[in-house]
Amino acid sequence: MKLIRFTTTDSPNPCFGVVVRDQAVPLAVLQSKAGKSSPHLTDSRSYLANLPDSERAAKEVCAWGEQHLGELGKNECFPLNAVRLLEPVEVAALFDFGLTPRHLKNSAETLMKYEKDNPQTAPMLQAFANALLAPKPKPVPGRPEPLPYYKCNMNTIAGDGETVPWPAYTSRLDVEPELAVVYGNEKQPVAGFCIFNDISARDVQATEFVGGFCLTKDMAKGNQLGPYLVTLDEVGDPYNLKVTVVVNGHAKYQGSTSEVSHKAEDVFAWLGFMAHPKPGSVIGFGTIPDCTGLDHDDFIDPGAEIQVTFERLGTLRCRFAEPTGKLLPSRWPVRPQMQKYHV
């Protein structure tokens, strides 16, 4: 089952629904037509808080919709390509873990390429690179394995098909495709999976390793989630999905979720050791190796149309806008494609 939140051209109010074939259908409509009534399908918060009962109820009316889609009227179902897909759940918290070691190694190499002569950042980056190679500390009895993460800007969450304003402070805007899990509740921790595109400004990143990522990660519409919340039965093995990034119609990056080092139960255990996650908490596992400009030192230009596709999870689209004015001086050499924005 693919759960969605969407708006239509006639209504700006978010609607909680499901995908039935190629249609976005409100769960309220399906319940009414199927003669069912569950208090847990009114919105994503209620759905997540009441798993697994809510999932069973949603699947029941979704099955009815598959059989009777033709009976729904014009204002009861909507072509997917005619609605605006929002982030698939009302997000309670957004955490981003670093559980893809090869991406971290690749990133350190590219960052060091440009920062090696900087006395402020080079020692820190070298220490980071050395830490990646260090043996893991011995487990502490009674404590889950510590896993590195940072907390994301809740004010910059966006859904599918958004245009990302190009920040004036960067010449290297980048995608970061990640597998994300949505937390349900203690009865059913895994509500499902979605795509997380953690858009990043690379030429300011090295300066923020100590205090935390601000300029690097907190740009408008920089935390993209979607296009659906896919339940586990449709995902299969979430840790063995092909990933492709298409830019302007051409495949640019490819990777796999098989390089994620830990599973959902591991991140839930570590978060729960400090405080239990709330329903609707979204956790990114880490950037898929080989799927960013930073991995290859090969970046995306302004105006690009981008499609991030995860096998079984769908395609999350965005566009990098053209800068609206002159860009600020970059800490790194300016790429030829960006020269015109610095004149």
Where are these regions (language model features)?
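Acidic, glycine-rich active-site loops and adjacent beta-strand->loop/helix elements
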Residues: M154, I199, I288-P289, R312
